[in-house]
């Protein structure tokens, strides 16, 4: 009977799951479970052909892996016509004190069941069950060899078990490895190893090479960028420079300068209050500094009055202020303008 190879399923897959999967296409005699793959023995080869055609590339398990199902290249142990196939493959490996046991009932088999099955061949030091396989460690290597020859392809709880040497002897910490795990590092295992892209992502060189987004963030948090965000000297001079305030006062209109510079703005006299409340109050008439008596003429009013004067803008000088005589003249000294206008010829005799 030629077994069917089934691979690429999950490591925690159970023998019963594979058996139920292949049972849809014919009677399954047994399933020889390994680490990550298995050999399925079917009673009729035509049923095995149907299973290969239907299940190859079939999604199986929780992760939906695609199974690899095909004929094996050589017959394995358990073949009734050549029952020593598995024994020959085990004897070709380096003998050790630890045996690798598979294809038992992982749901119901306990450590005590394995001890009972292997105790007749020598003193057992340690028994460990890992999911669907187990390790049996003997005290002497000769006892392990005797147990291998006697128990391979034997029945344990109605299951035909497969026994081989472990790749590495168990030590005090129990670090035995299955022989199929070492074979599993062949091309089938390498295909499942991390891709070069992932290795590149985890390498120190990739960590030093920043992405464009990281470079942008680095630029934003750099000290140079922080200094550019600090207040500029220009803004400081605008906020705290007294020259800037004087420039603003210089740019104001003459009316605003008159209002700001006039001491009557802060006057609290009743006359000032009444004048401000008066509807006839002009913003250009300011009180004189003589206790609010009289009005000070603004430059604009003076200019308007000079334009409307019959003397064409010729006004009296401050030095000519005095009492007017009865004929409209002045009692004081004449201004230079009046002297220029006075007739230079002597008065005519009457």
From Swiss-Prot:
Gene Ontology cellular component terms for the protein in this record? nuclear dicing body; nuclear speck; spliceosomal complex
Domain of life per record: Eukaryota
Which segments show compositional bias classed as Basic and acidic residues?
Answer: 73-82, 167-187, 216-227, 240-255, 272-289, 299-308
The record's principal subcellular location, in a coarse class, is: nucleus
MF terms in GO: RNA binding
**Domain RRM positions:** 2-74, 97-168
Q: Where in the cell is it found?
A: Nucleus; Nucleus speckle
Region annotated Disordered sits at 73-94, 167-350
Q: Which InterPro entries match?
A: Nucleotide-bd_a/b_plait_sf, RBD_domain_sf, RRM_dom, SRSF
Q: What else is known?
A: The splicing pattern of the pre-mRNA is regulated in a tissue-specific manner and by development, and changes in response to various types of abiotic stresses.
Q: How does it assemble?
A: Component of the spliceosome. Interacts with SNRNP35. Interacts with CYP59. Interacts with RCF3 and CPL1. Interacts with DRB1/HYL1 and SE.
Function in brief: Required for constitutive and alternative pre-mRNA splicing. Involved in primary miRNA processing and pri-miRNA biogenesis. Binds both intronless and intron-containing pri-miRNAs.
What family is this?
Belongs to the splicing factor SR family. RS subfamily.
What this protein is called in its record is Serine/arginine-rich splicing factor RS40
From what organism does this protein derive? Arabidopsis thaliana
